[in-house]
Amino acid sequence: MKKILILANNDVGLYKFRKELIEELLKDNEVYISLPYGNLVDNLIKMGCKFIDTPVDRRGINPITDLKLLNSYRKLFNKVKPNLAVTYTIKPNIYASLVARFKKTDYAVNITGLGTAFQSDNLLRKLIVFLYKIALKKVKVVFFENEENQNIFINENIVERNRTCKLNGAGVNLEDYPFMEYPDENQNIHFLFIGRIMKEKGIDELLEAAGKIKKEYPTVQFEIVGPMEDNYKGVIDKYVGNGIINYYGFQNDVKPFIEKCHCFILPSYHEGMANTLLESASMGRPLITSNISGCKEAINNNGYLVNVKDSNDLYEQIKRFIELDYKDKVLMSKNSRKHIEEVFDKRKIVKETMKGLGS
């Protein structure tokens, strides 16, 4: 029985999006989980994982804390002696991979998105590219969730193409996100956004577009679900107070919100593969999202693409959807589910991942 060490920076993403993969790995292996303790860790332990509490500072680069993390990973590898390490998120991807490389341990890395650091040509980006080049020198496989991110790593000479594998995101569990009948024709139209309230998710453009739409279509509702960055509190309070949006904060279960909505909106600036789009489409909801890698893959006769950072285009596409015949909205709903079943079925993604890991 092999030992597999999974390293990440939080329990939520690992449990919510990789649960089925972990279940598959547990069939023939001992699975160790290294990340900071969180509310879902106990669920991972109940599945059969062995948990090792490892503090990870998710934001920014601090030489002192990052060296501590590197050292804690070194001790962890000495203790567990894994046959394979699997990493998620940037710091485990770099620092755990560095340890695995020099320990001559097989390791696989997951790039679920490039984040804000890769969006501008600055010193931080150059440092990250440099560290990735060293860390991934001997990697077994690097999994990507979209072709654009894959090509960036290849073109930057971070990793060779034959060591990469593109997956269709983390996939969707079709039973966890079942098709739900489209809302009744007589109901007020509800648009839904789920995500962190931050600039990179396109929240500024959404708020501006929503304000214009509400003037023309007062009965249309905009529902916002997700945790808020501190600098947006005043803005969100203002839009709620003016009756433009309804804000529900973070929700453990977003499915009731998806079921209620007529269309899901995500005007993000960059994504690896937007799980909220896939989950909403799986439940049969049309989509409006950015014409970028990580978002556009979810669209197939089931919604509209918008120009990134373009609030006017977003307004136009929202208006276009409102004016659409009800029967066409229902057809989009069915197309959403069909597309997810054909391309993003979690079972297919897990199978491809296991193949990439050599299992």
Q: Whereabouts are the PLM-identified features?
A:
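A conserved mid-protein helix/loop that constitutes part of the nucleotide-sugar donor-binding site
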Residues: 15-20, 189, 193-212, 312
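Donor nucleotide-sugar binding/catalytic pocket of nucleotide-sugar-dependent glycosyltransferases
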Residues: 52-53, 133, 137-179
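Aromatic "clamp/platform" in nucleotide-sugar-dependent glycosyltransferases that forms part
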Residues: 250, 269
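Acidic anion/phosphate-binding donor-loop and adjacent secondary structure
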Residues: 61-65, 154-155, 169-188, 256
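A short, well-ordered alpha-helix in the C-terminal region of glycosyltransferases
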Residues: 328-342
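Short hydrophobic beta-strand element within catalytic cores of glycosyltransferases
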Residues: 286-289
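Conserved acidic donor-binding segment of nucleotide-sugar-dependent glycosyltransferases
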Residues: 304-312, 320-326
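Short, structured helix-loop element that forms part of the nucleotide-activated donor/catalytic region
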Residues: 41-46, 151, 212, 221-244, ...
